[in-house]
């Protein structure tokens, strides 16, 4: 017993000695080298593995104001050349203004499809109605002869949820003609959508425009719930409806509804993340205290305390002042949007956003991309459960003039989150897309998780592996042990939001910091229906620096779910093995000396 304890102490000491230090990284503009420079692509709108090669691809929207055509183009990642290339997967619509594209497997055949929302420019007041078409993918193209249109016009862009827990994405929105809230389910028998009215015991308010509703677990039971962004027309206040999945049925009540922060005059798009890494999801909201956004703040709503807390304010900035931009530009892109990703890989989710920056010695402001590093804090007005944001203005973003979008994406599939940005030329009404590589110099660990759909495994139509289904809502949580013996927990939801250029990648990347230990537990939870059991499963002893693909088939038998582990070797793994080997040699020598 004493020898075992000595072995454990020595091993942990060697690991601490080897891996002590801070995370060092730099950013590099790689727009040209990945094939995105010099092309009039329109705006980056979504990610998805369209050709099912386990490499995520890019979806672009381009609206031509001259000929009235709207296009969606898919650029595929070429692993041999390390660049994105044009494909034959193209959607073209006449006399429309495309507002969004949402990749997903809408007919559950294992192929990635595309939901396209648009305004019909032939109609008077065309911006008051949003139309939806779903284009079904097959191999590396869209089946243009098998297009299904939503029979009803919506008031705004739809949200994607799994309302009935059948693991097939449903469409949620307010119908334009009567203003009521419905959800639409796809029927493969007649290739059509049928609607059902959303009913509740409480008064249902209209969804806000723009809306930022989400499909994710907020109750802590690993089953996805819904958080819907609504607006009270009489008070002009934003309210958030929380719909909890109880025995396979999504329900809400008055206690599950909360309002915007009292001090807020302007409300931005909601974002959700486990900010303090406690395994529970937090609601993150950019707000302006005044109508001009001269005082801007980021608030966090805790599901445990049911209160808003401030995590960042633009007061007391050193040498400059930042402020949110409340305008919506171009294709209807809300600028008050925060996108989440652990870019420094320390185990705490960071953020990126577009803001106006005014230097103290200048009168005019300049729009810039900024990064928000999630750092430790002891106390203070902007300290939320021991965490706060520290703003980072990197010079690499100087090439991104007049930015409108910024988000995180693993370009090179190496487990490190890079940065994608879009800038807008208002005079020419054209977009430029930018790729920024995130180079981590210190040996940090990661865990990349992709959860597939549960409709098929080896028997998918056409024999395809369902790697590109963009399953919305799976909840993922890990538990591991840090260098100091402390328990580390974090959680995230795959593709929790889709409307208004949410730009979420079709996977989850957890930074593990400089912790080379095995991930002790990985828990994955899926939506539940009324007739299904609880759908969650736990995997143990996951190797760090690996990508794990979860195949939840059959969905109602979690014990039979499969996992595919792809390891990304690094110096960290070798050093971990070296520490273990050195410990074993030391113990062997000690035993030998004592024996002789």
What are these regions (language model features)?
Residues 378-404, 412-417, 421-596:
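Gly/Ser/Thr/Pro-enriched helix-cap/hinge segments flanking short amphipathic alpha-helices
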């Amino acid at each position: 017993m004493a020898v075992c304890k000595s072995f454990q102490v020595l091993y942990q000491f060697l690991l601490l000695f080897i891996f002590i230090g801070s995370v060092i990284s730099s950013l590099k503009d790689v727009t040209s080298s990945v094939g995105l420079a010099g092309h009039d692509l329109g705006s980056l709108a979504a990610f998805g593995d369209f050709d099912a090669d386990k490499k995520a691809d890019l979806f672009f929207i381009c609206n031509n104001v001259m000929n009235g055509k709207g296009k969606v183009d898919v650029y595929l990642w070429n692993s041999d050349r390390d660049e994105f290339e044009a494909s034959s997967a193209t959607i073209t619509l006449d006399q429309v203004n495309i507002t969004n594209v949402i990749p997903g497997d809408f007919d559950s055949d294992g192929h990635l499809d595309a939901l396209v929302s648009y305004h019909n420019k032939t109609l008077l007041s065309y911006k008051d109605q949003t139309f939806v078409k779903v284009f079904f993918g097959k191999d590396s193209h869209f089946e243009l002869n098998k297009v299904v249109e939503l029979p009803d016009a919506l008031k705004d862009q739809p949200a994607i949820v799994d309302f009935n827990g059948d693991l097939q994405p449903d469409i949620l929105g307010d119908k334009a003609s009567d203003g009521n809230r419905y959800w639409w389910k796809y029927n493969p028998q007649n290739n059509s959508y049928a609607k059902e009215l959303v009913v509740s015991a409480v008064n249902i308010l209209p969804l806000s425009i723009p809306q930022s509703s989400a499909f994710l677990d907020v109750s802590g039971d690993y089953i996805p719930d819904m958080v819907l962004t609504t607006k009270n027309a009489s008070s002009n206040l934003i309210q958030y409806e929380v719909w909890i999945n109880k025995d396979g049925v999504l329900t809400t009540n008055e206690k599950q509804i909360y309002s915007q922060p009292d001090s807020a005059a302007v409300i931005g798009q909601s974002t959700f993340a486990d900010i303090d890494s406690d395994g529970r999801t937090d609601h993150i909201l950019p707000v302006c205290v005044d109508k001009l956004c001269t005082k801007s703040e980021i608030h966090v709503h805790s599901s445990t305390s049911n209160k808003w807390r401030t995590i960042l304010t633009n007061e007391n900035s050193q040498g400059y002042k930042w402020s949110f931009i409340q305008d919506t530009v171009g294709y209807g892109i809300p600028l008050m949007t925060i996108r989440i990703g652990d870019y420094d890989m320390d185990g705490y989710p960071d953020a990126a956003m577009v803001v106006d920056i005014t230097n103290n010695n200048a009168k005019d402001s300049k729009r810039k991309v900024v990064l928000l590093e999630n750092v430790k804090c002891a106390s203070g007005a902007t300290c939320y459960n021991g965490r706060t944001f520290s703003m980072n203005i990197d010079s690499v973003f100087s090439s991104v003039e007049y930015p409108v979008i910024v988000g995180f994406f693993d370009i090179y599939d190496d487990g490190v989150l890079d940065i994608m940005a879009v800038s807008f030329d208002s005079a020419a009404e054209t977009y430029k897309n930018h790729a920024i590589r995130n180079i981590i110099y210190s040996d940090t660990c990661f865990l990349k998780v992709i959860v597939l759909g549960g409709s098929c495994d080896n028997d998918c139509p056409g024999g395809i592996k369902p790697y590109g289904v963009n399953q919305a809502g799976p909840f993922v949580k890990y538990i591991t042990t840090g260098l100091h013996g402390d328990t580390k927990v974090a959680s995230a939801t795959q593709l929790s939001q889709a409307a208004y250029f949410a730009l979420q990648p079709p996977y989850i990347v957890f930074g593990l910091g400089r912790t080379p230990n095995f991930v002790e537990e990985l828990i994955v939870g899926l939506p539940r229906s009324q007739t299904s059991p609880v759908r969650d499963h736990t995997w143990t002893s996951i190797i760090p620096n690996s990508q794990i693909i979860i195949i939840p088939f059959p969905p109602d038998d979690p014990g039979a779910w499969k996992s595919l582990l792809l390891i990304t070797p690094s110096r960290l793994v070798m050093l971990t093995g070296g520490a273990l080997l050195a410990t074993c040699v030391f113990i062997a020598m000690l035993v030998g000396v004592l024996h002789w």
